[in-house]
């Protein structure tokens, strides 16, 4: 499912060798201010054919198509992606690396951003500010060659929908999401469906007490090892095939939400 996006005739790019630091030092906005240059806050993504990268920036201006920015040629640029879900269908078959160059980029939705990027191998979203993000379903759905991911360090405290976030990511081996903040997550169905090489997530450290839909969350995760027995699921209602095909996943206590509390009758005799 594709969400609308707008591409512009202007662009620019950084060293998008994913999971490696940029050749530009620090945040572009900060560098500009240190030099006494007043810079507007522009947020955009740049695709460069040089290394098939897609890089997200917060910078004072948007470079021109065909020029060089941070050592790479600008092939295409995308704007206005912060307030709605989007996907770059035109380049989805080419991108091999995704990275966020600057801090201060605060998308309200991440749903389907990289859906079906079939050649994507690495993604570094660590600098993305997801403090106020509310939806992230299908973020890396059907990225079958994705091997490395760095998730936003801010967690996703307001995200209610994470369904199919890593659906079909069959090459992904590990996610460093220990202690990750998914407190508001309600719909987590098929979140890791078919992640057959995934070995560790850190899910056992999560607090997802608001979760309702957990259908097929770890379906087919045959190499995953997670002990979820400590999860407190007070609101769950759906858990069909939660960990089918994932023998290393120890399920939560599904009876927890339905345990009846015995209330003792109040003894009023002492006050009479």
Per-segment meaning from a language model:
Residues 30-34:
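Periodic low-complexity repeat segments enriched in small/acidic residues
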Residues 36, 40-272:
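Negatively charged
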């Amino acid at each position: 499912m594709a969400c609308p996006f707008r591409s512009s005739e202007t662009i620019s790019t950084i060293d998008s060798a994913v999971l490696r630091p940029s050749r530009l030092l620090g945040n572009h906005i900060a560098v500009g201010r240190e030099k006494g240059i007043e810079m507007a806050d522009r947020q955009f993504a740049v695709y460069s054919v040089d290394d098939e990268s897609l890089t997200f920036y917060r910078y004072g201006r948007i470079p021109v198509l065909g020029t060089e920015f941070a050592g790479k040629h600008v092939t295409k640029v995308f704007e206005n992606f912060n307030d709605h879900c989007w996907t770059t269908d035109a380049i989805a078959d080419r991108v091999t690396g995704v990275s966020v160059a600057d801090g201060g980029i605060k998308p309200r939705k991440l749903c389907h951003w990289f859906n079906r990027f079939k050649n994507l191998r690495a993604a570094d979203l660590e600098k993305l500010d997801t403090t106020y993000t509310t939806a992230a379903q299908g973020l890396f759905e059907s990225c079958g060659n994705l091997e490395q991911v760095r998730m936003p360090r801010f967690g996703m405290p307001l995200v209610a929908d994470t369904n199919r976030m890593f659906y079909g990511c069959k090459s992904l081996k590990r996610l460093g999401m220990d202690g990750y903040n998914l407190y508001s997550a309600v719909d987590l169905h098929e979140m890791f469906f078919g992640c057959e090489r995934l070995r560790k997530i850190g899910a056992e450290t999560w607090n997802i007490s608001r979760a309702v839909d957990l259908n097929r969350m770890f379906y087919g995760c045959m190499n995953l090892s997670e002990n979820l027995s400590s999860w407190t699921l007070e609101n769950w209602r759906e858990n069909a095939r939660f960990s089918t095909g994932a023998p290393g996943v120890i399920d939560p206590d599904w009876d927890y939400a339905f345990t009846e509390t015995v209330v003792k009758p109040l003894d009023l005799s002492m006050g009479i």
